[in-house]
């Protein structure tokens, strides 16, 4: 589904199939929303233009507009609850610039571990994503804030930052910052205060 304005995002199906219906339905909270029902195909087929290779590309594209377009067309959004489109965050208003890019690894909700696991298992991809966003924002420093109760994630992310920085200057200016375990430090304003002081 295509976005309905600048502050909206493409929605892609997680399965191969055919759209059966687009209709208002209640979600789990009882709110009426537009739902897209898909009849799942027997065979998985990827859309044209989707890179399905398992290789991790570490060389950053030169063209910032290309990076933003790929982020937008692939429907990349934040996972903080509002699913805010990432391409919007990477386009500050004219005359404004980012002082620092902060990646939120401060998963402070009790019993949640998805951020922790992805930092352990996909640390290189996260650092590559940070470098892409840092480049689009004009090369500002990037900080990955992780609470001190996640030693495996801290180690994995630090190793990824160090090894990628040694391989290319594209990855300089990215650091892991260990944060005190504090609720609700994962909130936007609390995280900015913790990282920036």
Feature-to-residue mapping (PLM):
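Short hydrophobic beta/alpha edge segments that flank linear recognition/processing sites
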Residues: 1-8, 34-38
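Conserved short loop/turn motifs at secondary-structure junctions
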Residues: 3, 56, 140-150
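Generic structural motif
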Residues: 4-6, 11-21
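Acidic low-complexity segments
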Residues: 21, 26-79, 84, 95, ...
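Short acidic, glycine/serine/threonine-rich loops at helix termini
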Residues: 31, 49-52, 82, 88-90, ...
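Gly-rich Lys/Arg/Thr-decorated short loops/hinges at beta-loop-alpha junctions or inter-strand turns
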Residues: 46, 78, 101-115
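Histidine-anchored nucleotide/phosphate-binding helix
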Residues: 120-136
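Hydrophobic alpha-helical positions that pack around
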Residues: 143-197
């Amino acid at each position: 589904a295509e976005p309905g304005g600048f502050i909206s995002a493409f929605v892609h199906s997680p399965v191969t199939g055919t759209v059966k219906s687009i209709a208002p339905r209640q979600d789990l909270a009882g709110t009426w929303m537009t739902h897209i029902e898909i009849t799942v195909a027997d065979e998985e087929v990827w859309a044209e233009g989707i890179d399905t290779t398992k290789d991790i590309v570490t060389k950053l594209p030169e063209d910032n507009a290309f990076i933003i377009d790929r982020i937008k067309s692939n429907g990349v959004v934040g996972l903080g609850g509002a699913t805010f489109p990432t391409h919007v965050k990477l386009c500050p208003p004219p005359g404004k610039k980012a002082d620092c890019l902060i990646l939120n690894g401060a998963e402070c909700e009790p019993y949640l571990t998805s951020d922790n696991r992805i930092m352990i298992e996909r640390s290189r991809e996260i650092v590559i994503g940070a470098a892409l966003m840092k480049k689009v924002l004009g090369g500002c420093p990037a900080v990955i804030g992780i609470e001190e109760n996640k030693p495996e994630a801290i180690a994995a992310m630090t190793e990824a930052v160090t090894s990628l920085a040694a391989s290319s200057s594209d990855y300089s200016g990215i650091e892991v910052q260990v944060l005190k375990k504090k609720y609700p430090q994962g909130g936007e304003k609390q995280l900015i205060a913790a990282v920036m002081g």
